[in-house]
């Protein structure tokens, strides 16, 4: 799914509004995903998945950092996320459907924190962006 110039602008503007909250929003999205889709917990058997756990916060920060990197490389997501793609495909072997579940949780989290900025156009652009990130992260499964 190709991001248009308007999509790229929307993604960059929305992520800019996230600012210093990226790690917190990443952790919140993970917690939301674990609660809404309990099967996703199977990839984190060694984590304390309770509300506010340091491990969820730490992984949320990693998710946020990867997304921040992706936002900075919208024209080369495969290059920017190559190592992360290798990790998820070859070492962690995460079921690709889980990226869609996390994407949904991220959208809900962003909508709840940025209600005035989360217009239908921004929603659509972020959805396309997360879909592209998911596609890149699963590209090496083949």
From Swiss-Prot:
Domain Globin: 2-142
Keywords (A to Z) from UniProt: Heme, Iron, Metal-binding, Oxygen transport, Transport
Residues the record lists as binding heme b: 88
Tissue-wise expression: Red blood cells.
Pfam families: Globin (PF00042)
Listed GO MF terms: haptoglobin binding; heme binding; iron ion binding; organic acid binding; oxygen binding; oxygen carrier activity; peroxidase activity
PROSITE patterns to which the protein is assigned, alphabetical: GLOBIN (PS01033)
Gene Ontology CC: one annotated term: haptoglobin-hemoglobin complex
Residues given in the record as O2 binding sites: 59
Any one of the GO BP annotations: hydrogen peroxide catabolic process
SUPFAM superfamilies: Globin-like
Membership in a protein family: Belongs to the globin family.
General function of this protein: Involved in oxygen transport from the lung to the various peripheral tissues.
Subunit structure, as described in the record: Heterotetramer of two alpha chains and two beta chains.
UniProt name for this protein: Hemoglobin subunit alpha-3
Species for this entry: Bubalus bubalis
């Amino acid at each position: 799914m190709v991001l248009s110039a308007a999509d790229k602008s929307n993604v960059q503007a929305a992520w800019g509004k996230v600012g210093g909250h990226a790690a917190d929003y990443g952790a919140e999205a993970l917690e939301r995903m674990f609660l809404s889709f309990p099967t996703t917990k199977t990839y984190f058997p060694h984590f304390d998945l309770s509300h506010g756990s340091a491990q969820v916060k730490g992984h949320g920060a990693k998710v946020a950092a990867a997304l921040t990197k992706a936002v900075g490389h919208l024209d080369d997501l495969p290059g920017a996320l190559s190592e992360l793609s290798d990790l998820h495909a070859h070492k962690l072997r995460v079921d690709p459907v889980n990226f869609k579940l996390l994407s949904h949780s991220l959208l809900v989290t962003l909508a709840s924190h940025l209600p005035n900025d989360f217009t239908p156009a921004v929603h659509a652009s972020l959805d396309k962006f997360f879909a592209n990130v998911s596609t890149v992260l699963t590209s090496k499964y083949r």
